[in-house]
Curated annotation (Swiss-Prot):
The keyword NAD does not apply. Pathway: Siderophore biosynthesis. Probable cyclodipeptide synthase; part of the PUL gene cluster that mediates the formation of pulcherrimin, a red iron-containing pigment composed of two cyclized and modified leucine molecules that acts as a siderophore, a chelator that binds iron outside the cell for subsequent uptake. Two leucine molecules are cyclized via a cyclodipeptide synthase, and the resulting diketopiperazine is oxidized by a cytochrome P450 monooxygenase to generate pulcherriminic acid (PA), which can then spontaneously bind iron to form pulcherrimin. The keyword Membrane does not apply. Disruption phenotype: Impairs pulcherrimin production and subsequent red pigmentation. Keywords: Ligase. This is Probable cyclodipeptide synthase PUL1. It comes from the Eukaryota. GO terms for molecular function: ligase activity. Its EC number is 6.-.-.-. It comes from Kluyveromyces lactis (strain ATCC 8585 / CBS 2359 / DSM 70799 / NBRC 1267 / NRRL Y-1140 / WM37). Transmembrane segments: none annotated.
Amino acid sequence: MYQLLFQRLGVTLTAGNDKKTSIPSNQLVGHLIGLILLCDDLNEAFADFQALLQNGIAISSSDRGYLVFDAHVTDCGCHLRAQMIQDVFSYFKNHEVTKLYIFDAVAKKLNELKRHCISLIQTLCWENTSAQKLGFPKNIKSYEELLKLLQWDTADISSAIADSFPMNPNNADQNEKGLVWNVTKLEVVLEFLYCSHFLSKNKIYNKKENLDSVTIDFNNAFEKRQLLSNKFHCQGTGKLGVGCRYLKHAKQSKNSFISVVSNLQSRLALLSIAFLKSRCTLPCDIEALQKNSPRNVSAIPNFLHFLILEREWSQNETPILLAVRKLHEHEHCDLYFEARINPHTFEWTLQHKECCEFEHHTPYIVITALATGSSTTKTAQLLAWELMKAQKNFRQFWLTFMSQHRQYPFEIEHDEDQLLETQVSQDIFELYCQSKREDRNQILFDDSTSLLPKHIFTEYPSIFFNFQKNVCSKHGALVI
């Protein structure tokens, strides 16, 4: 079970990112606080997921549903995570009675570990008791040894997990090349939910004059972590006062926190590639198309994302909600369409709908887009009519957009063309080249009207509509 909740998430590595690096006794309190915060993060993610399945709303954020799992990663793969959460939702929704209790069992063990850590900190830090007197060695060899010393034992739930999930979590392959996307494997689901939730709650929307974007708010997130840490250590008021030997190491450094975030982004990007591999029926090798950024975030060309997803969405009849925002000066109006993809031709069909006409208890793939150019002088009815008229061209629009969309890290070395030419079939490469040459703005409209996709995610329609009302940025729909 170490692999299940800790090795799998990378937290068995010490601050030096080396499994062999030991934990000195004067750093013990800091690592215990780190485990406490991790337990809270895990429990919050799992509780939100259960609440969404059972009640359709997240506990941690009353105005969001599955948006609490809308992670920020630099691989331009938001549409992949949208389908991944759809996969997880569908699996657990169909097995709710027999599967969901696992999250309660895991939460119980995490709470036990948290209480043990808090009690130990009280003894070490406030009562100034030597760690050696409590049976701890001067240097703890690894996080695995620390967890054993903390009596982290999940034998009482291992059998229940084995009964409900075909793959024993203890046998999880830690080799990145062996990483697979399989929602019947509990360790995969737990990692995905935790990484997605953490990277969602710590992101912020930037609303600049000419650009909307999203990033991790490191300053605010780090400050929150520090405030949480202060609740557990003595802050220099214990028996040794300001000279407390644990105080120096009780708080995580900002650089260490940034490394944790980068590690979670890297893991989620790898899971996204594993998802692509599990769904790919194209004549290509996904691993050979993988490129790693200087920050160790892996990516596959966006063009292939779409070719794989259009097959996935059409075969599963995945409900798609296209939300188009039209801006004019300081006013805006929103148009909503339900989209379907033909599994044989991959052509799109659109149905213009009002908010009340969507299935509000079904999570949709939501695509937000911004209409600009001549659209500002058009009525909402005319713009909706033009989009309906152009629906036969929507596939080509998406192929063109995905082939031209700037994607990190491919934009650094400009080698995407060469990579695709050598790794995909001639038909796919020719389709890519043709799409990349086209003028995206001329595919759907005859005038200067332009449609710019902003973001793709999974959400219940009712929650999305309420959330959309509050996102009235001057230059964006639902900012990415």
